[in-house]
Design a protein with these regions (language model features):
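Charge-dense, helix-prone N-terminal extensions
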Residues: 1-191
Length: 191
């Protein structure tokens, strides 16, 4: 389905906001085309695109290269249970203070606050090791030592992966895999 989504090219932040205002409620998502800095210095910036998306309840994800001069990034309506990063929560607070949030964006925040997805990454962002992982690491001292020595970004990657498990069995599997990888001093699941 992602590949079938429309590519949209806008030249600046106001044009992107206009597109979102017009289409946020009806579009399943789009690939937003970005110019690379070397090609067009006065381009739409990623941070600006994300902020405008948040204003309408949308979020960014996958990036793909188009050419030497352009790339695309997937923007879609935020799912009700999608998690909120610390950075996006800070952006939303600032945008709300500046009175730039639109009703759809405010509704997405209200939904997230009501269902708990607004806070679901707080422990991950704070690098708090959950009890199940702490106990499993304690049983394998080399894994515990390696995990503790990992850079914050590496630990956060593992903690996020574990926190996103939907079923207890999946979470237990991810905890075991994290311990096994940490014992091998693998700083990432993709190493």
């Amino acid at each position: 389905m992602r590949d079938a989504l429309e590519q949209v090219y806008v030249t600046d932040r106001p044009a992107w906001r206009r597109w979102l205002v017009q289409h946020h409620a009806s579009s399943p998502g789009i690939w937003l085309v970005f110019d690379r800095a070397t090609h067009r210095p006065d381009r739409l910036l990623y941070a600006d695109a994300v902020e405008e998306a948040l204003c309408t309840g949308w979020i960014d994800s996958t990036v793909r290269s188009l050419s030497d001069t352009q790339y695309v990034q997937l923007f879609t309506p935020r799912k009700p249970t999608s998690t909120w990063s610390r950075l996006n929560k800070e952006r939303v607070a600032r945008l709300a203070a500046e009175d730039r949030m639109l009703p759809a964006g405010l509704a997405a925040v209200a939904t997230a606050t009501a269902n708990g997805s607004w806070e679901s990454l707080d422990a991950v962002e704070a690098l708090i090791v959950p009890d199940d992982l702490a106990n499993a690491l304690a049983a394998v001292p080399v894994a515990a030592a390696n995990f503790a020595a990992f850079a914050p970004a590496s630990r956060k990657g593992y903690l996020h992966w574990i926190s996103q498990a939907k079923r207890p069995e999946t979470r237990a599997t991810r905890v075991r895999e994290t311990v096994a990888l940490a014992a091998q001093n693998q700083k990432s699941r993709h190493s």
